Amino acid sequence: MPAIIIDGNKIAKKIELKILKKVKQRKKNGERIPGLAMILVGNHIPSQIYVNKKKISCKNVGFFSECWNLPSNINEKEILNIISKLNENKNIDGILIQLPLPPQINHMKILSSIVPDKDVDGFHPYNTGSLCQRTPKLRACTPKGIITMLKYNKIKTHGLHAVMVGASNIVGRPMSLELLLAGCTTTVTHRFTKNLKDHVQNADLLIVAVGKANFLKGSWIKTGSIVIDVGINRLKNGKVVGDVEFKTAYLRASYITPVPGGVGPMTVATLLQNTLEACENHDDI
């Protein structure tokens, strides 16, 4: 039997409607609306597209947003000065650094300069460490969004053998911590992993984030497994595909995310959730 498609667009819209309702209530109560500042360095076209999507999403849920478009030859000190001002700005609840940054910029130094309670991307060492200690604060958007997708589909994760293919700081590593928190027995594979196929075939829950089109063969997937494809890859013919060979995987999995329309919308929706959460936390200070 073909897999059930996990519709990220549908879930993201439900989340955004809930956020909009809360923002309207805040305005009705005379409270401040959430504010998000985005920093974009250089002319990286995909990054510009992502930032524009986030600006539109902020507008749709009633947030205030601003974007700092900075030249690619900017130095670290200038970016740090901007972040310092945003850290002190009481109208800004979240600060987002659109990655990647130019090679002359130390991205960890930049990310670590954001105060943790405004780190709505969840990349600050404090927030990563809090997740590791099982006391999550602001959590990385894509991994948190994936957990939300599973919950919306009433997929029970406790006791599942989860295999994370990819070990990036943005997805793979924080996702492995989320999976542990969700009660999974978790395996993380990476570019040095031997016999990847063997690991994949043993996965009850498979999450793939390597950034290579159709990298993982659908025939490797265990019948009845849950497949989450994080990859977004554009082929020469313009078609957008994931990291998993979808047609074959669809016939073997019990649940699967499409590309596009799966994980992507959830990442943005989770960013909005984090920004609202940060705003509410700032109210309590």
Curated annotation (Swiss-Prot):
It comes from Buchnera aphidicola subsp. Acyrthosiphon pisum (strain APS). NCBIfam families: PRK10792.1. One of its GO terms (biological process) is tetrahydrofolate interconversion. This is Bifunctional protein FolD. The lineage of its organism: Bacteria, Pseudomonadati, Pseudomonadota, Gammaproteobacteria, Enterobacterales. It catalyses: (6R)-5,10-methylene-5,6,7,8-tetrahydrofolate + NADP(+) = (6R)-5,10-methenyltetrahydrofolate + NADPH; (6R)-5,10-methenyltetrahydrofolate + H2O = (6R)-10-formyltetrahydrofolate + H(+). CDD domains: NAD_bind_m-THF_DH_Cyclohyd. Homodimer. One of its GO terms (molecular function) is methylenetetrahydrofolate dehydrogenase (NADP+) activity. Pfam families: THF_DHG_CYH, THF_DHG_CYH_C. Keywords: Amino-acid biosynthesis, Histidine biosynthesis, Hydrolase, Methionine biosynthesis, Multifunctional enzyme, NADP, One-carbon metabolism, Oxidoreductase, Purine biosynthesis. Belongs to the tetrahydrofolate dehydrogenase/cyclohydrolase family. InterPro entries: Aminoacid_DH-like_N_sf (IPR046346), NAD(P)-bd_dom_sf (IPR036291), THF_DH/CycHdrlase (IPR000672), THF_DH/CycHdrlase_cat_dom (IPR020630), THF_DH/CycHdrlase_CS (IPR020867), THF_DH/CycHdrlase_NAD-bd_dom (IPR020631). Catalyzes the oxidation of 5,10-methylenetetrahydrofolate to 5,10-methenyltetrahydrofolate and then the hydrolysis of 5,10-methenyltetrahydrofolate to 10-formyltetrahydrofolate.
